[in-house]
Amino acid sequence: MANNEGIDNSFLDTVKFDAKGLVPAIVQDHETGKVLMMAWMNRESLEMTLERKKACYWSRSRNKLWLKGESSGNMQDVYDILIDCDGDTLILKVSQIGGACHVGYHSCFYRRVLENGNMEICDTLMFDPEEVYGKKS
């Protein structure tokens, strides 16, 4: 049974953005709990995500809003958003269309570290990034 006593229900005012106005968002498959990726959100991307129910992030490399799947078609339908006890980290539970990772895998966490220190691929390749984004020059 949920107990809402003492909880400030104003979500956006509860989020503690860092000095750059960002908060980390861990993205999970809403059915399996599998971690798909980690991305950054600012207030505007979070508001857009809440409004559209499609994941929108802040691209630090491009310095602009990034609607996930906008160029690749690999959208994320948002089912749930959780906030941690400190208010400084989010979890987005999504339905992933295609791969979450820009290199083509279902999850960005597609490499497992072995006991000997080597790595192995532990996930499914969903698409060829050159076909989706074009060849890197």
Curated annotation (Swiss-Prot):
GO terms for cellular component: cytoplasm. Mg(2+) binds at D84, D86, D88. Pathway: Amino-acid biosynthesis; L-histidine biosynthesis; L-histidine from 5-phospho-alpha-D-ribose 1-diphosphate: step 3/9. Its cofactor is Mg(2+); Zn(2+). It is an enzyme of class 3 (hydrolase). GO terms for biological process: L-histidine biosynthetic process. Its EC number is 3.5.4.19. One of its GO terms (molecular function) is magnesium ion binding. It is found in: Cytoplasm. Keywords: Amino-acid biosynthesis, Cytoplasm, Histidine biosynthesis, Hydrolase, Magnesium, Metal-binding, Zinc. Zn(2+) binds at C85, C101, C108. It catalyses: 1-(5-phospho-beta-D-ribosyl)-5'-AMP + H2O = 1-(5-phospho-beta-D-ribosyl)-5-[(5-phospho-beta-D-ribosylamino)methylideneamino]imidazole-4-carboxamide. InterPro entries: PRA-CH, PRib_AMP_CycHydrolase_dom, PRib_AMP_CycHydrolase_sf. Binds 1 Mg(2+) ion per subunit. Binds 1 zinc ion per subunit. It holds the Pfam family PRA-CH. Catalyzes the hydrolysis of the adenine ring of phosphoribosyl-AMP. Homodimer. PANTHER family: HISTIDINE BIOSYNTHESIS BIFUNCTIONAL PROTEIN, HISTIDINE BIOSYNTHESIS BIFUNCTIONAL PROTEIN HIS7. NCBIfam families: PRK00051.1 (NF000768). Belongs to the PRA-CH family. This is Phosphoribosyl-AMP cyclohydrolase.
